[in-house]
Regions:
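Active-site beta-loop-alpha junctions enriched in small/polar residues
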Residues: 12-16, 41-43, 72-76, 96-98, ...
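C-terminal helical cap(s) of enzyme catalytic domains, especially alpha/beta-barrels
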Residues: 108, 189, 203-229
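N-terminal amphipathic alpha-helix/helix-capping segment at the start of soluble metabolic enzymes
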Residues: 1-15, 22-23, 222-229
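A short alpha/beta connector and helix-capping loop motif
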Residues: 44-76, 80, 185-201
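Conserved, mostly hydrophobic/aromatic
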Residues: 21, 28, 39, 83, ...
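Glycine-rich, proline-tolerant flexible connector loops at the mouths of alpha/beta enzymes
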Residues: 35-53, 143-149, 202-204
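Conserved beta-strand positions in the central sheet of alpha/beta enzyme cores
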Residues: 10, 29, 35-37, 68, ...
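Conserved anion-binding
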Residues: 17-20, 62, 66, 78-82, ...
């Protein structure tokens, strides 16, 4: 997975209108989303329940954009094949979700998918050092996972900078998720993020504003990181 030529924006469907879900997917696709981010929650690893493989399958039918599936579930391994078969392009598991992170990442790759590892705000960067050779993406949670619309945790940027240094020379993308807006995107991009997950900041205001919101987040991040589309 080569580094992107610009900062990518991945709208999180957790903030979409579930009553018109397919329309929402197609609207953010048309508005310029680079990826579509799906937050899968089990009510156990995180204190919320969202959706499963059948919803991912429905989203796959509605868009050709890459599907970025973030598994906030424990255990994750029994469900990897189902999400891969449903159409995920990239599957991210949490470092905190089980004792056998190598096994989970190897299983994702064996399914022919890109593999990501996520870190909660309180988990140190060093937790992923042993598996860097197995990952295509590192996701730094910038809020505690479970709910949308939370406030960006600025202190996670130091962890992101450490991860970038730790992974120097590797072909790895760095994603941030939580509290991302046009105001917080510059800090994330300056610290090294090249994939920004945004939920409320994209979906509030209705479909007619999705394109403006995506462009504002991407533009603010690119100016901070020195990248220009």
């Amino acid at each position: 997975m080569s580094p992107p030529p610009r900062v990518l924006v991945a709208p999180s469907l957790l903030a979409a209108d579930f009553g018109r879900f397919t329309d929402e997917v197609q609207a953010v696709d048309a508005a310029g989303a680079d990826w579509i981010h799906l937050d899968v929650m089990d009510g156990h690893f995180v204190p919320n329940i969202s959706f499963g493989p059948d919803v991912v399958r429905a989203v796959r039918r509605a868009t050709t954009k890459p599907l970025d599936v973030h598994l906030m579930i424990a255990p994750a391994d029994p469900y990897l094949a189902a999400f891969a078969e449903a159409g995920a392009d990239l599957i991210t598991v949490h470092a905190e979700a089980g004792p056998h992170l190598h096994r989970s990442l190897q299983a994702i790759r064996a399914l022919g998918k890109k593999a990501g590892v996520a870190l909660n705000p309180g988990t140190p960067a060093e937790a992923v050092e042993p598996v860097l050779e197995l990952v295509d993406l590192v996701l730094v949670m910038t809020v505690n996972p479970g709910f949308g619309g939370q406030v960006f945790i600025e202190s996670t940027m130091e962890k992101l900078r450490r991860l970038r240094t730790m992974a120097a020379g590797r072909d790895i993308l760095f994603e941030v998720d939580g509290g991302i807006t046009a105001e917080t995107a510059p800090a994330a991009a300056a610290a090294g993020a090249n994939v920004l997950v945004a939920g409320s900041a994209v979906f509030r205001g209705g479909p007619e504003r999705y394109g403006t919101a995506i462009q504002a987040i991407r533009g603010a991040a690119e100016r901070a990181s020195g990248q220009w589309a």
